[in-house]
From Swiss-Prot:
Name listed for the protein in its UniProt record: Small ribosomal subunit protein uS14
Swiss-Prot/TrEMBL keywords: Metal-binding, Ribonucleoprotein, Ribosomal protein, RNA-binding, rRNA-binding, Zinc
Encoding gene per record: rpsZ
Database matches in PANTHER family: 30S RIBOSOMAL PROTEIN S14 (PTHR19836), SMALL RIBOSOMAL SUBUNIT PROTEIN US14M (PTHR19836:SF19)
Ligand binding (Zn(2+)): 24, 27, 40, 43
Subunit structure: Part of the 30S ribosomal subunit. Contacts proteins S3 and S10.
Cofactor note: Binds 1 zinc ion per subunit.
Single Gene Ontology MF annotation: structural constituent of ribosome
Keyword DNA-binding attributed: no
Pfam families: Ribosomal_S14
InterPro entries per UniProt: Ribosomal_uS14 (IPR001209), Ribosomal_uS14_bact (IPR023053), Ribosomal_uS14_CS (IPR018271), Ribosomal_uS14_sf (IPR043140)
Amino acid sequence: MAKKSMVERWKKPKKFKVREYTRCSICGRVHSVYREFGICRVCFRKMANEGKLPGVRKASW
């Protein structure tokens, strides 16, 4: 989990639009963030397994 001061820092608008980047809304992770859900792959997997993401199911073929 990210420090509270860092979370507040990320929320502030950037001086230049180019400097903005996606972060996980739950843990603050920078890499592998799904834009559609706004969360990282780690949080996505955890929430999907708990059934907290509607319409998401485990693939089986």
